[in-house]
């Protein structure tokens, strides 16, 4: 777990930096262009490549050195951040240039998440998989739980360019953490190749199967699995619609609230709303014996109710409370959907 702990630390720092940049760019685009579509374009450029490239990145993580993929992804994303910094040097940053930098950074960052999660298989025994996975989820949640409030406090002091510089610095720290783990594993493997080979045997078997299937074959196999199970198709469609609705709400929150609150207050509101994820995760633990369909229905119902309530309240803190309910409901639906998917596939 020592090596996993170092990777988790790097992931936490990097996630925090990513959240700082995302918050700062959204605020600047709204202030500069005055439209929700400008903020939406930046968010789309930042997250769409990660989602679209995730299957291919996962296939690559099964075939190549995962730590090297993480180093390339984190170091390469600095290039995109440099493009964004160049755009922000203008008094009126061009939307196209900012989006281009976000796309470049996001495309390279897409390599890191699947490789990081797959590294759990390499570095920990089977009985520690759940523990390591939980640590990774907690680290990735930093961009939602801590980054907005921190960005709201820092932005009046150092500006959005300062936030982007911090983000680039966190990428380099993550590269250093990953490189340290990679070097330590190579040294340990050279000193005791027998023990290292025994530890890596399960991962090598998985990679061998993936290499035989090929990246494209793995993607097509996953698609055929979804297409051949009516229950999976319905579940994917349902979660796609729910994710789309939540994405629309997230994009519109800042344009709705920024005219009424300060940047620091906006960051605090987002952080308070995101803490609902911790409550939702606790509810999943308490309801661990509930049927997955019950979890899915409860999560989607809570999310839908919260979204309906958003425009009915009196002000910013009402929106924060509705956001809290939305994030608290998400772990329920995600846990239910994951169990249903595993049941269909297995």
Model regions and ranges:
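Alpha-helical transmembrane-bundle signature of multi-pass membrane transport and export proteins
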Residues: 1-346
């Amino acid at each position: 777990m020592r090596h996993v702990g170092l990777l988790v630390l790097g992931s936490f720092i990097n996630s925090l930096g990513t959240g700082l940049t995302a918050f700062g760019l959204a605020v600047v685009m709204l202030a500069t262009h005055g439209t929700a579509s400008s903020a939406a374009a930046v968010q789309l450029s930042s997250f769409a490549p990660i989602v679209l490239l995730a299957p291919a990145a996962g296939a690559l993580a099964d075939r190549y050195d995962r730590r090297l993929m993480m180093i390339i992804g984190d170091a390469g994303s600095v290039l995109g951040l440099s493009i964004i910094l160049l755009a922000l040097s203008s008094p009126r940053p061009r939307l196209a240039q900012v989006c281009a930098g976000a796309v470049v950074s996001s495309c390279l960052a897409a390599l890191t998440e699947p490789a990081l999660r797959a590294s759990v298989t390499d570095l920990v025994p089977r009985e520690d998989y759940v523990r390591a996975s939980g640590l990774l989820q907690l680290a990735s949640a930093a961009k939602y739980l801590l980054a907005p409030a921190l960005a709201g406090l820092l932005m009046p002091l150092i500006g959005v360019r300062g936030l982007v510089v911090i983000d680039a610095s966190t990428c380099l720290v993550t590269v250093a953490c990953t490189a340290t783990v990679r070097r330590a594993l190579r040294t340990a493997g050279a000193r005791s190749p027998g023990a290292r080979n025994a530890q890596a045997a399960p991962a090598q078997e998985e990679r061998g199967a993936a290499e035989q299937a090929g990246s494209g074959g793995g993607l097509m196999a996953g698609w055929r699995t979804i297409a051949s199970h009516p229950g999976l198709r319905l579940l994917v469609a349902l979660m796609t619609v729910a994710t789309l609705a939540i994405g629309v709400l997230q994009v519109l929150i800042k344009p709705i609230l920024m005219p009424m609150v300060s940047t620091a207050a906006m960051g605090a509101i987002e952080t308070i709303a995101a803490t609902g994820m911790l409550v939702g995760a606790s509810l999943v633990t308490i309801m661990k014996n509930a049927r997955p369909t019950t979890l899915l229905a409860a999560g989607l119902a809570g999310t839908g109710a919260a979204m309906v309530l958003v425009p009915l309240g009196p002000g910013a803190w009402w929106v924060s409370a509705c956001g809290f309910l939305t994030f608290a409901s998400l772990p329920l639906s995600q846990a239910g959907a994951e169990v249903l998917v595993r049941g269909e596939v297995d």
